[in-house]
């Protein structure tokens, strides 16, 4: 190889490297909106920490499920150190390790979820809370598989040992979240699951009997449909978790103030605690 060809080849390699590692401004901005999720045991000690993102301006967020298992409460910490309490679980899936939940936050600037899947060879960035002041790790998509006919399962050209073992948020070059990473063996490529699947999670009337949600001390949110919400309220009345019943009955009254079911359930709850003035 002569000197001219060597210089051309070297320039091509450098250009490719720079293009791969250069961080678009939208990616750097989005990475600063990755927040810290902290879950706590019943005694107040920390159970686990992970990363999460808000998906709407009303305090809805997604993360992996694992930190919530066995948790009595949870908080989110933003980049300024401000904490927000997780108030309700909006859904969970053990197989794909996803959780969707509601916080007390409002008027939050959410992260946009990519509607189109990324393709093999596409540049992506792996971000976490406090990730070097918004400087995520660059990678590329190695391969993409499809599950449930419409969601993407990504394998990256990045090994688990090259970044933190915690779950991170995966962004495309437009600063849109495409997935949440899964911790993998150090010798294996890092995997990520489509964030759109987390958005699809929801509760049902039978969520109180869900073996996954039953391991979480944070109450589930009422289902959107009234008949399913009533079913959840009825099942809550048969459980021994009085705090959960109080939360569900209060939510039902807030959503359906003209229906008597929530009031009667809450009255029975107060009577069971001999709080007759509250039941009146």
Question: What does each model-identified segment do?
Answer:
Residues 1-25:
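Bacterial Sec-dependent N-terminal signal peptides
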Residues 23-26, 109-155, 161-165, 181-192:
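Flexible, gly/ser-rich surface segments that form the specificity/activation loops bordering the active-site cleft
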Residues 27, 179-248:
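C-terminal cap/linker of serine protease catalytic domains
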Residues 23-24, 40-64, 83-85, 167-168:
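A conserved glycine-rich beta-strand in the N-terminal activation segment of trypsin-fold
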Residues 56-127, 132-136, 160:
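Conserved active-site neighborhood of the chymotrypsin/trypsin-like protease fold
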